[in-house]
Amino acid sequence: MNTHNAYENVIVRDVFDLARRECNCHGVAVTGASLGAYHATNIAFRHPDAVSHLISLSGSFDISSFFHGYHDDNIYFNSPYEYLPNTPNPWKYNHMGIILGTGEWDNTRHESYRLSEILNSKGVKHWLDDGKWRGHDWNYWRDMLPYYLSKL
């Protein structure tokens, strides 16, 4: 987790700072597909002050299988399924435009639904888009991302 946390710090400090300077804006949009959607989602919810929009494509958010039963605070605070239900201030996410994209052939579809249920339970505004004829692969994501960007 130390390497992951260092990676996240580079993204939030260096990449986000560069994006804000280049675009002359306060918040940045983050997106990713599959495990990349996990990273984008985790960064967005851990740093809501820096993120204006989140687009998750076929997100895979359950990281527990990577640790074979090991669990500590680093894992807890990097697992949206764990820390989001316990957040005392869900209002801090409502400025973000949040899109969770999935489809009927997406093998991680249940994960987007689970995240949506958590967000609903906390009153966090978002759009769960469950499209027909969509799966968990690049050919679907190539169509989904431009569509979602057009909705921002």
Where are these regions (language model features)?
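Non-catalytic cap/lid and distal C-terminal segments of serine-dependent acyl enzymes
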Residues: 1-152
